[in-house]
C-alpha cells in the first residue's frame, strides 16, 4: 500500500529545517562578530526572520543569545555585561553594551531548590 503523506508532516519538516538554519545563523553570528559586527547583526536578523516566518519558537538558550533591540549577539565580556542581582527577586541581569538594553532573567527556582536541599540536610543532621 502506498503511504500518503499528510500536509502536516510537510509543515513539521519545514519548521525543523527553519530551526536548524536559525541555530546555524546564530552560531555563525557569534564567531563572525570579532571580524565583522555588522555581518553578525545581519545573521541574527536573518535567523529571527526565518524563525518568525516558519512560526518556530526559538529555544530559551538561543533567545537569550542576542539582543532583541539591536540584533547584536550577546557575548559575555565583549558585547554584554552579566551580573547576578540579589534584590527582592534574585535575577541575572544582562546588559547589552551596544544599545544599553537590560534583560533580567529570574533564577528564584534554583534558589528555592538549594534552600530546600539545605533544609533537608539540616533535618538529617538533627535526626542522626
Swiss-Prot record:
It is an enzyme of class 3 (hydrolase). Its cofactor is Zn(2+). Keywords: Cytoplasm, Endonuclease, Hydrolase, Metal-binding, Nuclease, tRNA processing, Zinc. The keyword Zinc applies. It catalyses: Endonucleolytic cleavage of RNA, removing 5'-extranucleotides from tRNA precursor. It is found in: Cytoplasm. This is Ribonuclease P protein component 4. Its main location: cytoplasm. One of its GO terms (biological process) is tRNA 5'-leader removal. Binds 1 zinc ion per subunit. Part of ribonuclease P, a protein complex that generates mature tRNA molecules by cleaving their 5'-ends.
Amino acid at each position: 500500500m502506498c503511504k500518503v503523506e499528510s500536509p502536516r508532516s510537510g509543515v513539521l519538516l519545514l519548521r525543523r529545517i527553519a530551526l536548524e538554519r536559525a541555530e546555524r545563523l546564530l552560531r555563525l553570528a557569534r564567531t563572525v562578530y570579532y571580524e565583522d559586527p555588522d555581518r553578525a547583526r545581519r545573521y541574527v536578523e536573518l535567523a529571527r526572520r526565518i524563525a518568525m516566518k516558519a512560526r518556530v519558537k526559538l529555544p530559551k538558550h538561543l533567545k537569550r543569545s542576542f539582543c532583541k533591540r539591536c540584533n547584536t549577539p550577546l557575548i559575555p565580556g565583549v558585547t554584554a555585561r552579566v551580573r547576578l542581582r540579589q534584590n527582592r527577586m534574585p535575577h541575572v541581569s544582562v546588559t547589552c553594551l551596544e544599545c544599553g538594553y537590560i534583560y533580567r532573567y529570574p533564577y528564584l527556582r534554583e534558589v528555592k531548590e538549594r534552600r530546600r536541599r539545605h533544609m533537608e540536610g539540616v533535618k538529617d543532621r538533627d535526626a542522626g
